[in-house]
Regions:
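Helix-start/capping segments and mature chain N-termini
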Residues: 1-89, 111, 118-308
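Extended, Lys/Arg-enriched charged tracts that mediate electrostatic binding to polyanionic substrates
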Residues: 98-113
């Protein structure tokens, strides 16, 4: 029904606006359209077992979009403003929050774009920050089941020391051709290799890659990978459970030695490559229980939304 907006003009953020329009008035020479000054986030609100509503790791997403803004020479959205607008968007659209027990959630998409018109290559001086929402089910049609992943060596997602660690639309556009190729071959996603040597595992489609090797949770350490809030959460759950965590380079050849593997991200938590193993399964369900209020949130990851 509603989205919320805030404009940055004359060196400051203005008042929050509530809109029912799905469109914005944008100059065709805006920096977002001409030169890609656009960043976004993705997080979820859940209807919990107790009937209350919570948003998972809102502050972490606020910090990440701040980093993305700095990476694209944009004016960062203050964390307080980010959180306030997310909460407003959830409250205004409360009728779209799926019921507890359905496996669905309310997906929240914060978006910041440069709106200053300029044909010359320069950073914008004016921006708009928008928060929109949509009810969603599982990202992959199979949910937490088998989703086969392939390596396509002829494609790179990002350049070394490039923009891969920021959440900007260009990175996703760069993966569309390879993703289409993978789908045509019968796979759900592409596991990219590092763009420099084509030796180490990198991003896994729109998500982080992980594997379980001899009881150790391993995930690639790469400056071209978007730092996943979900992966960060899973690694913390591993440490809480006494599972060793290693963030390091993982070679392609090492894949033959792992017992479990898959992708993790906000949209589907964990998607196993092949048959889900016991460690992946427990981590998936543990994180879901925390999100749904079925298990104690010892790290304070959930923000409760009052009044709904």
């Amino acid at each position: 029904d509603y989205n919320v907006r805030c404009y940055y003009r004359d060196g400051k953020w203005g008042e929050i606006e509530v809109s029912q329009s799905p469109t914005i008035d944008l100059n065709i020479a805006a920096s977002a359209l001409q030169y890609g000054q656009e960043i976004f986030e993705g997080l979820k609100a859940f209807r919990r077992k107790d009937g209350k509503v919570s948003v998972f790791r809102m502050e972490a997403n606020a910090r990440r979009i701040h980093d993305s803004a700095e990476g694209l020479c944009m004016v960062p959205v203050p964390e307080e403003l980010f959180c306030k607008m997310v909460e407003m968007a959830v409250k205004l659209n409360k009728r779209f929050i799926p019921p507890y027990g359905t496996g669905a959630s309310l997906y929240i998409r914060p978006l910041e774009i440069g709106i200053t018109p300029s044909i010359g290559v320069r950073t914008a001086t004016e921006y708009v920050f928008i928060v929109m929402v949509s009810p969603v089910g599982s990202y992959f049609k199979g949910g937490f089941t088998t989703n086969n992943i392939c390596i396509l060596r002829e494609y790179d997602r990002v350049a070394p020391k490039g923009m891969g660690r920021f959440k900007t639309g260009g990175n996703y556009a760069a993966g569309m051709k390879s993703g289409q190729h993978a789908h045509d071959l019968g796979y759900a996603s592409v596991l990219f290799l590092d763009p420099k040597e084509k030796k180490y595992l990198d991003e896994c489609g729109p998500a982080n890659f992980f594997a379980i090797k001899d009881g150790v949770y391993i995930t690639p350490a790469s400056e071209s990978i978007l730092p996943s809030v979900t992966n960060n959460s899973i690694m913390q759950l591993c440490r809480d459970s006494g599972i060793k965590v290693e963030e390091r380079h993982i070679t392609v050849d090492e894949l033959s030695d792992v017992q479990e593997a898959g992708a993790c991200g906000v949209k589907y938590v964990i998607s196993a490559d092949g048959k889900p193993g016991p460690v992946s399964t427990e981590l998936y369900h543990k994180l879901r229980r925390i999100q749904l209020g079925e298990e104690e949130d010892v790290h304070g990851w959930n923000t409760m939304i009052d009044g709904i």
